[in-house]
From Swiss-Prot:
Record-given protein name: Ribosomal RNA small subunit methyltransferase G
Enzyme Commission code(s) on record: 2.1.1.-
Binding site for S-adenosyl-L-methionine: 75, 80, 126-127, 142
InterPro entries hit by this protein: rRNA_ssu_MeTfrase_G, SAM-dependent_MTases_sf
A family per Pfam: GidB
Role according to the record: Specifically methylates the N7 position of guanine in position 518 of 16S rRNA.
NCBIfam families for the chain: rsmG_gidB
Gene3D superfamilies listed in its UniProt record: Vaccinia Virus protein VP39
Gene Ontology MF term list: rRNA (guanine-N7-)-methyltransferase activity
Length: 239
């Protein structure tokens, strides 16, 4: 590894957080520092803070993800938060959704190399796959878009009474306030700001949780989902 991409020492907390998958987490960090930088998936300046700012920051999201649910990581990029979440939670079924080919190629390589059998990589935009992918219990996202825009992509992918978990920074409260009207139209019934990672990361990771009701995405998307379901049933009968 070049000096410019020198990884920092692995924090002691990583062993506790990743457990049996600790070695895989280390390998993932190495892949980000090497192939991730070469392919332009992360900037070289991020390498010295890969553990604190990226891997651990994302892994602690697991604290607020229910057990045994389906997850779609929207705009997964280099796999953050999807891959750290997958490493600490093998009870989840995770889809990494990413539109760019060079990123999905990297994600596929990582998933295969680390043996993440509970993870699927899908190339596409959220608005393109709605109705094609099964609705999920949880949508995750990090550094994708402001909350109001992110919600228009993420919420329609949810099952009824699902939730979107967006990792945000200092702007979380401001973004949530600005997105109130948009979230309401999309079927959001409850919102909250959570702080996770006590004893693992400092500052704590900030998560905006958006819980939806019976019609995630609102009436417009409920109609689209119903049409997609009817089309799917027709195709199965013909098959």
């Amino acid at each position: 590894m070049s000096e410019a991409a020198e990884l920092p020492p692995v924090p002691e907390q990583a062993r506790d957080v990743f457990g049996d998958r600790y070695a895989d987490a280390v390998r993932y960090a190495e892949l980000l520092a090497e192939a991730g930088v070469k392919r332009g998936l992360i900037g070289p300046r991020e390498v010295p803070r890969l553990w604190e700012r990226h891997l651990l920051n994302c892994a602690v999201l697991s604290e607020v993800v229910p057990e045994g649910v389906t997850v779609c990581d929207v705009g997964s990029g280099a796999g953050l938060p999807g891959i750290p979440l997958a490493l600490v939670r093998e009870d989840l079924k995770i889809t990494l959704l990413e539109p760019l080919l060079r990123r999905t190629n990297f994600l596929t390589e990582v998933v295969e190399l680390l043996g993440l059998d509970h993870v699927t990589v899908v190339r596409g935009r959220a608005e393109e796959v709605m109705g094609k992918l099964p609705p999920v219990h949880v949508v995750t996202a990090r550094a994708v878009a402001p909350l109001d825009r992110l919600a228009t992509w993420g919420i329609p992918l949810l099952r009824p009474y699902g939730e979107m978990l967006a990792l945000k920074g200092d702007t979380a409260e401001e973004e949530l306030k600005a997105a109130t009207a948009a979230l309401s139209k999309l079927g959001a019934e409850q919102t909250s700001i959570l702080h996770v990672g006590e004893g693992v990361v400092s500052p704590l990771s900030t998560v905006v949780r958006v819980e939806v009701g019976e019609s995630p995405g609102g009436v417009r998307f409920a109609a689209k989902r119903a049409k997609a379901a009817r089309t799917g049933r027709t195709r199965r009968r013909r098959g």
